[in-house]
Amino acid sequence: MEKALTQRDYESLADLRHHIRRFLHFSEVAVRGLGLEPHQHQLMLALKGLPGGTRPVIRELAEQLQIRHHSAVELVNRLSTGGYVQRQKGENDRREVLLTLTPKGERVLRELSLHHRAELRKAGPALFGALQRVMRSIKSRVGREADLPDRNGEYVRHVGPERRQTPSRAN
């Protein structure tokens, strides 16, 4: 890892952080305006956005939100009390607890998601531009061969303009 940073590096990182924070602030205000806390909204969105085949269980949501299991349980408890999510027993394993959004939860999440999407239409280009500047800075500093994430977040080695290969794990 390169250790030297330029003033431009700091400026581009600060600009990216600023645009991320602006969007997060928008989100917090929108969510609280509907009587929820940001983590509650994040859990509802994570639940609705789970990839197909992923079991909607607390362990999975805790991983998605990068929080501890007991914190996810508390969020689910509050959302359940508020009528936003419900627990159901698993069909094959009755010990398993599956989570679903209630109609109220679906309605509120849809409203928030529409607001977030509209805000991203406005703020997205500046956020994307800030991210591109940071990534260009990284790429220019490490040269033509660099491990950079693809659109799935997987790191791939870019070798010249035509070839891509997965970096070896033996580092």
Give names to the regions the model predicted:
Residues 20, 37-43, 105, 120:
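The N-cap/first-turn positions of alpha helices
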Residues 77-135:
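Charged, amphipathic alpha-helical coiled-coil/dimerization segments
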Residues 1-7, 118, 129-171:
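C-terminal regulatory/oligomerization modules of transcriptional regulators
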Residues 58, 76-77:
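Short, hydrophobic-biased segments on the C-terminal half of alpha helices
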Residues 25-68:
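N-terminal helix-turn-helix DNA-binding core of bacterial DNA-binding proteins
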Residues 1-34, 82-84, 150, 156, ...:
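N-terminal leader segment of winged-helix/HTH proteins
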